[in-house]
Regions:
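A domain-level signal for caspase-like cysteine endopeptidase catalytic cores
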Residues: 1-74, 88, 110, 115-116, ...
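A short, glycine/acidic-enriched catalytic loop
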Residues: 81-112
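Short, charged beta->alpha transition segments
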Residues: 64-68, 75, 96-105, 124-129
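Glycine-rich loops and low-complexity Gly/Arg-rich segments
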Residues: 35-37, 70-73, 101-104, 138-141, ...
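Short His-Asn-centered micro-motif
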Residues: 79-80, 90-91, 113-121, 143
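Conserved beta-strand elements of beta-rich interaction domains across eukaryotes
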Residues: 16-17, 84, 120, 147
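Active-site-proximal C-terminal subdomain of hydrolase catalytic domains
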Residues: 120-203
Length: 203
């Protein structure tokens, strides 16, 4: 890769199981990406989320412009939750994309929103672009299908690396992952129904 330096990832992760003894987490994926490249690699902030109110609180923290509280160098928002069409599920109630857009309220300029969840973006392109405009985000990324957590975690090593590296040009990440030179990447993209929507995306 020959682009700009990595931006950080601000990760919001819900509970994957009702039994809280189960320690399933996407955090090791983030730690791998951090550790593989050392000081030059990906940095992250990771928060476990149990309720919609907690998600709203930490989204507001992520987007804060208060002195000493800025996360402007964490330009990828990683939303790892159970999901379904147009929704993510922190555990204590569902959150719609409309809810999330209202919380963000246009403050996600220059950021990428990645939904690591089942079917959240199984929507018309124009509906997703409406969400994009409402949030002010540079790109919205996610799956149109139900996904298996292990497959998603494996692909997230590639996807998060690309999104954080090409954060100023998300379409370049899309091109990288879909390149005919990388058919093994393409297979993951198709299996997960991955889409990367930007303001210039066609229906």
């Amino acid at each position: 890769m020959t682009e700009s330096k990595y931006t950080g990832v601000f990760a919001f992760e819900g509970d994957w199981h009702r039994n809280l003894r189960n320690m399933s987490s996407m955090r090791p994926t983030l730690e791998t990406l951090r550790d593989i490249f050392g000081a030059d690699g990906l940095k992250f902030s990771h928060r476990r989320i149990g309720t919609a109110d907690e998600l709203e609180y930490y989204v507001d923290k992520w987007l804060s412009e208060e002195p000493g509280e800025s996360y402007d160098d964490y330009r990828v928002g990683y939303f790892a939750f159970h999901g379904e069409q147009g929704l993510i599920s922190p555990g204590g109630g569902d959150v719609s994309l409309d809810d999330l857009a209202g919380w963000i309220n246009g403050r996600a300029q220059g950021r990428t929103l990645y939904f690591a969840s089942c079917s959240t973006l199984d929507l018309e392109t124009e509906t997703i672009k409406d969400f994009l405009r409402s949030t002010g985000a540079r790109a919205v990324v996610g799956s149109t299908k139900s996904v298996f957590n292990l497959e998603l975690a494996a692909f997230d090593l590639l996807l998060l690396d690309s999104l954080a590296y090409y954060h100023r040009r998300p379409h370049a990440a899309d091109n990288y992952l879909r390149s005919p030179k990388r058919p093994h990447f393409q297979a993951f993209v198709e299996e997960l129904g991955l889409i990367i929507i930007t303001p210039s995306s066609k229906p």
